[in-house]
Amino acid sequence: MDQKLSQLIEELTTSGESQLNAQKMKELKKICKSSEEQLSHAYRLLMTQLTQDHAEIRLSAFQIVDELFTRSHQFRVLLVSDFQEFLELTLGTDNDHPLPPPREAAQRLRQAAMQAVEGWNEKFGEAYKKLALGYHFLKHTKKVDFRDINVRTLAERKREEEKQKHLDKIHRESADRAKREMEEMSDEIGCCLTEVENCFRLLVPLDLGPYREDKFFGEASGIAEDHAPCAWSPDLATPRGSGLSGPQDEEQPCCSKDLVASAHHAGSAVGLKAPAPAATEDPCRDEDRHSEHSDPEDFLRSHGLGSHKYTLDVELPSDGLKVQENEDNLAVLHAARDSLKLIQNKFLPAVCSWVQRFTRAGIYSGHLKQAIDLKMELELALKKYEELNIEPGRGQRSRTEALEDSEEEDQDFVEVPEKEGYEPRIPDHLRAEYGLEPKAPLKTLEKHTAVCSVQERTRRRREEEASDPTSAAAQMLRLQDCLSSPSSSSTRGPLGPEEAQKQAERARAPMVPFGVDLCYWGQEQLTAGKILKSDSQHRFWKPHEVEEEVDSAHVSEMLHSRHITFSGKFEPVQHKCRALRPNGRLCERQDRLKCPFHGKIIPRDDKGQPLNPEDRAREQRQQLQQQRAHPDWQDPEFMKDVEAATGVDLGSSKYSKKGKGKKKKHPNLTDLRERANTARARLEKKVFAKGAVQRVVAAMNQMDQKKHEKFANQFNYALK
């Protein structure tokens, strides 16, 4: 009975489900009703499960406790006697021992425990004094708010307040840094915006009044939308309040002031609404401007108009404003693009970051407004550039790129003085003096040049390499001459079978050039690779024991080893193993000669059977040997069925063909060892990996060794 009770409690608490199994819970209640000893035993088992470091186990155990608490007086007496420990395990009232993970299950456990304790106090508080005292302790000492949805204790609220203060401090420091950055970069941003606006004025020289820098793009877009023809009449061109009419005999030259004023009248004629002059404008200047163009004939003459008898219709394109890139505005466009690139890549992200920092901190409202204004100005500059619709010239870009490429090519060349006595072309009658062959006729050269050019270059390169005594080709030629001369000069009789076999093996053996490793072959004590130290005769800095010879391990290793570069051609493996696996699939490994699981790779059909009869017979023999080694009664599946029927362990796990993977004890519970896939966890996995730590330790040791070697003779550093 005790074994059955412990098994039921273990299964119920380790199920990992939010609700208990009703059938098993019914069996547990039945066992607890049988005797008080079983009830006490169940209480001890439940308290043991409540001490587990897993919130899901504690939650299931608490649900069982709640069921038994409402039904048994004996269980209530046992629980109230250990009520403080129960509160620490279910509510986490002890600050030093909070509830274990997972966090969601711990939160549900705390909420369920608070509701249960409050209900127990209302129902059984008068009969059980310790229960009422525990409720009073939670409410008044631990400051637990039973109406709080999150059911937080005083310690938890303090922790959250400290966490919030820490976040506020971080946001405040970030806002302070943003304030300093803003004070440093505001002037630079203003200069960049001014440069962009000046470039825009040079590209689109519209004059629409005193506020043209703020409205010329908006006015131009408004004109493009209302592309109706506007009639121009001399009445519109006549200044208001002039009161003068009739021709004027004197011809006055057109000056810059006339052009500016005329531009104002032309803008009003085509429908551009220029804003009214400011109230603070000087009235004397206004009177002078009206008096200068009081005569309509002078106005017509300055604009190239003949008479008042015709009208002008001005049609604006509907596709908006366009700027054509040419040689005149190329420098301005380059300057504007550089400034806009600086705005887009540096200033605008920085300003957006300032706005976010000031918003999170909730302070520096003036700086926040200034940052928002800067952001709007930067975005407006980018929008203006998009509205320009700059069309690159046809040949402008190609000419610019060609000019830059030519400048780079000129910079790559280095001026070298001409060699004295150098003749770029040798005459035909002097070729014999230089040891050159006479030139072939032109027809012969034209005939054979295309065929023999590659072969001739290859042959000349080989001859040049062979002529150099320090090259590998010259060494190979010398070795070939040495090997061929004794074989050609010596005349031997017929060779015996052993000598013939040795000669055949020598012929098949690869030729290895002579090296340092062959020079010291078989020598145990090498004379080379030793460092000889000269004996010093000074009596002060001479050590007591002097090693006259020091062996260098690196040099000794070089004398015994040789690095040979593979000069062959890599051929990828095309075939597969295709052996039949236990799951019915074919092995897809692409080893060259031997599969590590199925042995030598042989040709097989689509079912994994060998195509060669010899291989098929060999595999059948191997299968028979395996069957003899493992009888049929040792089949893992058969043994598992017998174990399930009899309840006796026959050792089926020992004969199982599966790997020795560690089986989880409670697979339904959340694995606490599996960490959340967060950025911090991934960084910790990489930074604190065993290999990374070893590399860091090796680098630090190397730094210390270098420092020691550099300052070992100085007592000031040697003592540190």
Curated annotation (Swiss-Prot):
Protein name: UV-stimulated scaffold protein A
GO MF term set: chromatin-protein adaptor activity; RNA polymerase II complex binding; RNA polymerase inhibitor activity
Keyword 4Fe-4S attributed: no
Phosphoserine found at: 294, 406
A Pfam family assignment: DUF2043
Keyword Phosphoprotein applies: yes
Biased composition (Basic and acidic residues): 282-301, 602-621
Record text on subunit structure and interactions: Interacts with the elongating form of RNA polymerase II (RNA pol IIo) during transcription stress. Interacts with the TFIIH complex during transcription stress. Interacts with ERCC6. Interacts with ERCC8. Interacts with USP7.
Function summary: Factor involved in transcription-coupled nucleotide excision repair (TC-NER), a mechanism that rapidly removes RNA polymerase II-blocking lesions from the transcribed strand of active genes. Acts as a key adapter that promotes recruitment of factors involved in TC-NER. Facilitates the ubiquitination of the elongating form of RNA polymerase II (RNA pol IIo) at DNA damage sites, thereby promoting RNA pol IIo backtracking and access by the TC-NER machinery to lesion sites.
Upper classification of the organism: Eukaryota, Metazoa, Chordata, Craniata, Vertebrata
Processing after translation: Monoubiquitinated at Lys-419 in response to transcription stress; this promotes efficient transfer of TFIIH to stalled RNA polymerase II.
